[in-house]
Structures are given as C-alpha cells and as structure tokens.
Design a protein with these regions (language model features):
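Short, acidic, Ser/Thr-enriched surface-loop or helix-capping motifs
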Residues: 20-21
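Short, small/polar residue-rich loop motifs at catalytic or cofactor-binding pockets
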Residues: 11-15
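Ligand-binding grooves and catalytic loops that recognize ribose/phosphate and carbohydrate rings
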Residues: 112
Length: 123
C-alpha cells in the first residue's frame, strides 16, 4: 500500500531503527554519530521520543530540494550524509540524483580548498 511504502521507503534512521553503541549511547544511525541519549541514564522510549529523533520521522521538516521533492515520503534522502556535509539532518541530501545542482556546488567548493601536504607524510 502507499502508506506502507511511505513508512518503509528510504532511510529508516530514527524512524524504524536506531544504533546502540556498546556503552549504551543511542544514535539515529551508525553513520550519524550524534548521541541522542544513553540507555544507562534514560529509557529507550524517552530517547526515541527526543525532539532530535522527531526530525527523522517528520519529513515535512526537510529543507531545500528534499523538502520540495515529490518522493520525500518514499525516499527522504540520507540524513547522515546531509548532516556530514551541512551539519543539519534536515538539509538536502547532496548525493541524490535529483539534487545534482547542490552536488556540483559542493564539488566546486572542494576544488577551491587548497590543502598543503608535507612530502614526509607519504614516506
């Protein structure tokens, strides 16, 4: 059904699953090391209901292209990738084919950054 596709479709981080680290820290995803809480201090339910986790369940909060995309309820983009590139889990997913303009901008930004590397680093 459409409802099931929209629920299961795309990334399940913070919507269908969460990651639990060995010491009890809960993150929305293994690729998003943002600690939301710790099971030694709070219940899983309280962590799951944290406002930060709600960002993953409410796709109407998505920004940029992902927020306007007709597939946002089926896809939703990778929230970890958005966070790692922009520092915001609600930002557009730069890896999405429908978001190619943003991807080109990121590539241009990377080319403008000049990194000095010591030749000793490769010996």
């Amino acid at each position: 059904t459409k409802e099931l596709t929209e629920f299961i479709g795309g990334c399940g981080a913070g919507r269908v699953y969460a990651a639990i680290e060995p010491e009890g820290t809960v993150t929305p995803c293994v690729f998003l090391p943002y600690p939301v809480g710790n099971l030694r201090i709070k219940s899983f339910w309280d962590i799951w209901m944290d406002p930060f986790m709600e960002n993953f369940r409410n796709r109407d909060r998505l920004k940029g292209f992902c927020g306007k995309c007709p597939y946002k309820l089926i896809c939703g983009g990778c929230r970890a990738r958005a966070y790692n590139y922009f520092g915001d889990v609600l930002a557009p997913d730069p890896g999405c084919i429908y978001n190619s303009a943003e991807w080109r901008k990121l590539q241009e930004d990377i080319l403008r950054i000049k990194v000095k590397v010591s030749p000793l680093a490769f010996k």
